[in-house]
Regions:
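Hydrophobic faces of well-ordered beta-strands that scaffold small-molecule active sites
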Residues: 112, 149-154
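N-terminal accessory beta-strand-rich subdomains and adjacent acidic, glycine-rich linkers
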Residues: 1-140, 144
Length: 154
């Protein structure tokens, strides 16, 4: 997935971590060139999460423009923001091309992972709440009630 923005006046945000210290926020100014987050370990995880965001310089939890991008995929990924010589920004997310190849035979298809994009004019908090609502509604599997015969479970 790629999407272009007409300017580069944003901060770049991503999440990283380790065991027992997941989801640390890393926020840096967006610069000319490419800023990226990736996994080549065969999985996405708390080390590098397949999520990035572009934020207006004044954005915080309660106000400011935030564009969030989350790849719904648990394998190798590449998420990047590239600013060109005209100060336009291109955000790209997808399967990491490192060590990846897929030969499509005639009449075969390949479905790429989905990217869920969220815009908030009310800061990171609203973006986060929107993601939570979307994932609970669309991606959370429905749990069917189970009946257990406790009488025979002694």
């Amino acid at each position: 997935m790629s999407i272009d923005f007409n300017n580069s006046d944003y901060d770049f945000l991503h999440l990283h971590g380790a065991w027992a210290r997941e989801r640390h926020i890393e926020r840096t100014p967006l610069l000319i060139g490419t800023q990226s987050v990736e996994s080549r370990r065969g999985s996405s995880s708390h080390n590098q999460n397949p999520f990035i965001a572009l934020l207006s310089k004044d954005a915080n939890e309660e106000h400011g423009d935030v564009y969030g991008f989350n790849l719904v995929y648990s394998g190798n990924f590449l998420a990047q923001a590239e600013v060109d010589q005209y100060k336009t920004t291109r955000v790209s997310l997808g399967i990491n091309p490192f060590d990846f190849s897929w030969l499509l035979k005639p009449n075969e298809s390949f479905q790429t992972p989905e990217v869920v994009m969220v815009y908030s004019s009310n800061g990171l908090g609203e973006m986060s709440r929107t993601y939570h609502k979307l994932y609970r509604k669309r991606y959370k599997p429905s749990i069917k009630p189970r009946r257990t015969n406790r009488w025979t479970c002694r």
